[in-house]
Amino acid sequence: DIIKDVKEKNAVTNLNTKGVNLTKEIANSGQKRALTNVQKIALIQKVLDEEVRPVLIADGGDVELYDVDGDIVKVVLQGACGSCPSSTATLKIAIESRLRDRINPSLVVEAV
């Protein structure tokens, strides 16, 4: 049983290593590949969670990713941000510009 467990762990480690190496190879190849929808959504969610939401939460608001349709990112502004007169500025400056810088310059953010 121990030998079997070790072999399984080694197989998983080897598979993970191959995946990491392939990712590094693609990243270092200089070729730009278009993001898949899953990758794009994951990156958008990561930027929102790590860079945008903490700022909005500090002001009594929040943002939720609603949908992604091509380069259109639909979000729901919540809390104080939902009724704030500056919500358009928040949408364009705090959210859209950050997503454009981090992911793709052609992204457009819309409130729903």
Swiss-Prot record:
Natural source organism: Anabaena sp. (strain L31)
GO MF term set: iron ion binding; iron-sulfur cluster binding
Keywords: Nitrogen fixation
InterPro entries: FSCA_dom_sf (IPR034904), NIF_FeS_clus_asmbl_NifU_C (IPR001075)
One GO BP: nitrogen fixation
Gene (UniProt): nifU
Function: May be involved in the formation or repair of [Fe-S] clusters present in iron-sulfur proteins.
Name this protein carries in UniProt: Nitrogen fixation protein NifU
Keyword Zinc recorded: no
Family statement drawn from the similarity comment of this UniProt entry: Belongs to the NifU family.
